[in-house]
């Protein structure tokens, strides 16, 4: 229903470094080089991470050991029967439609293969190869940073990961290992619950005639930058058995990707960092990776949702509020550096929430560890909601009106093309 400008077609030219190429075979190779090294942003931008270490794991004295249990045929059969037949095949060319139609026949041997992976702590290499499609998201068509990589993994790897993810999340949730301020990719949590929690805290402070200041933290290529060694250490601290750790070590090893577009395929390149894009396990593993960052918030409040982090605090004195926020922000930055996650200072913003209290035209700057001043903004889009400094939601309402107007206009212009059944729905 939307007229989307995003395109998966290759550009006529692409710039990598100081070189611009128009040869399409070189364009897909350059895209692959760019996407496969996206997770190196921290290493390239930071010569040293001195005085920064990964945040300490929260104490969990009675955490039981976690080991994989055998996957059942009935569960695999259900997964296969629920496959979307219109999804693309991965580099193994195994079509989801074929697996769906043959589910009752292939479920048993596939289940045996999955369980053999647990026993051997090995995953077939074909399941660790991704086809990446560059999707233009706007801006300079020559700039590879203006393209979003859409990763297509083999269908069987996603079926397998779905079963693994259920076991992992059951263990994590049953032992309440996730922080209460972590809402990303958890059952019963979501953008709505996270936004409501933050807004409730801010509105409560405003109603008490207190100042409230927030930092909206943006990380550069966060999912692509996950350090596998640190993540394995996190899993170990959460009670994962040696066999599980060996399986996850193999899961990350020897991953490759190729760029695929317009019938062409680049050569494979190794991907040595990050959680696999498009995977089922990736979001859960990323939540594990950043979970204990919340411990560094100190006197401020924090909420985590995937790679969207808000740090905020309030009180009767603006100077004290900003001082506390700066102290907490420094500690959070050290934690992110310890995880080798790079702060995107240009996209990290500050906001003062205030309806009636006197406030200076130029409040005290909140600065990064590198000495850059963060920009104060009056409007910011947080988890899909446009927040303004007075919490009037006027900006959000205007965006909704514009979107509704556009979609109603589309329906009106194309009403003659709709079937009678479509019109009735």
Regions found by a protein language model. Name each.
Residues 86-94, 143-152, 193-236:
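Conserved catalytic palm subdomain of right-hand nucleotidyl-transferase polymerases, strongest
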